[in-house]
Amino acid sequence: MSQTRKFLVAVGMLAATAGAALAQTYSVGPMKVDQPWARATPGGAKVGGGYLTITNMGATPDRLLGVTLPQAARVEVHEMKMEGGTMQMREVKGGLEIGPGQKVEFKPGGYHIMFMDLRSPFKQGDKLKGQLSFEKAGTVDVEFKVESIGAGAPAAPKHGH
């Protein structure tokens, strides 16, 4: 193998592992939580939104029962959907079931985590430590990275093969 080819292979492997290292992935049992993030909030705001992706890697369903975050007095899982030509937002009561092999994306305009009665504003660049609780898998510690106020989902890292 030529020196140039060896170098390119090494750079490709480094890039692939660096992308994986930058991805925020957390696991508890078969439940995988990817890229938790939140939007920055203006001063005085009492609510904020959190987003992530949950994948059930197991063979049985599980249920997201709740989320906790010290900066919020109350946290709920909400769903937004169109009903009769109007966008409706409601709390998901009783937890959100995630079937075997199912991936659920929490994103603006869909499922999201509603942080309520904020104790302090979320500032871009902050990292908010919280927990997700699943019915069967248990509890997992996560860190929500705070993006800008108008941010969309952060780009997923690209993995080279």
Task: Tell where the protein language model's regions lie, with residue ranges.
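Bacterial N-terminal signal peptides that target proteins for export
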Residues: 1-11
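Repetitive helical segments and hydrophobic/amphipathic motifs
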Residues: 14-15
